[in-house]
C-alpha cells in the first residue's frame, strides 16, 4: 500500500516532521548549530558558577537581559514607527480624560447655576460658588 505524497495546502503548512530541512542538514549548518550550542553551554556554565558561588556579593548581571531591558525602555524612539493609529490613541489618551473632566465640571456648574437663578437651591452657609 503506497501513500500519496503529502502536499501542503494554503491553510495547513508542511508539518515539521515532514520538513526535509529537518533531517538533510548541510555540514555548515551542523557546525553553526554546534557553535551556538557550545556558546549557550559556556554562558550557562558561567551563570551557574556565579549563581552557586558561596562568596557572592551583589547581583548577577545577565548581559542579554540588560540589552533586552535597554531596548525595551530607553531605546524606544529608534524602534518606534508613528502610524495614524498611534497618533489617534496618543491624542485619545492624552486629551480624552481632560475633555471628559471638563465636560463633567462644566455641566455640573451649569446645572447648579440654573438652580441658583431659579431660586431652588438652598445656599445656606455658602461662601463661594
Swiss-Prot record:
Transmembrane segments: 88-105
Membrane topology: Single-pass membrane protein
Alphabetical keyword list: Acetylation, Electron transport, Membrane, Mitochondrion, Mitochondrion inner membrane, Phosphoprotein, Respiratory chain, Transmembrane, Transmembrane helix, Transport
Presence of the UniProt keyword Lipid biosynthesis in the record: no
GO CC list: mitochondrial inner membrane; respiratory chain complex I
Cited InterPro entries: NADH_UbQ_OxRdtase_NDUFB4_su (IPR009866)
Subcellular location: Mitochondrion inner membrane
Signal peptide coordinates: none
Region described as Disordered: spans on this chain: 1-26
Gene: NDUFB4
Protein known as: NADH dehydrogenase [ubiquinone] 1 beta subcomplex subunit 4
Protein family per UniProt: Belongs to the complex I NDUFB4 subunit family.
Superkingdom of origin organism: Eukaryota
Amino acid at each position: 500500500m503506497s501513500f500519496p505524497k503529502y502536499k501542503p495546502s494554503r491553510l495547513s503548512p508542511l508539518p515539521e516532521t515532514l520538513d526535509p530541512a529537518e533531517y538533510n542538514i548541510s555540514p555548515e549548518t551542523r557546525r553553526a548549530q554546534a557553535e551556538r550550542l557550545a556558546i549557550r553551554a559556556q554562558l550557562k556554565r558561567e551563570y551557574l558558577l556565579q549563581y552557586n558561588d558561596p562568596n557572592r556579593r551583589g547581583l548577577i548581571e545577565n548581559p542579554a537581559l540588560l540589552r533586552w531591558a535597554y531596548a525595551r525602555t530607553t531605546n524606544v524612539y529608534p524602534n518606534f514607527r508613528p502610524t495614524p493609529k498611534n497618533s489617534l490613541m496618543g491624542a485619545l489618551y492624552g486629551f480624552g480624560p481632560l475633555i471628559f473632566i471638563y465636560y463633567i465640571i462644566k455641566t455640573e456648574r451649569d446645572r447648579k447655576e440654573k438652580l441658583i437663578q431659579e431660586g431652588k437651591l438652598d445656599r445656606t452657609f455658602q461662601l463661594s460658588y
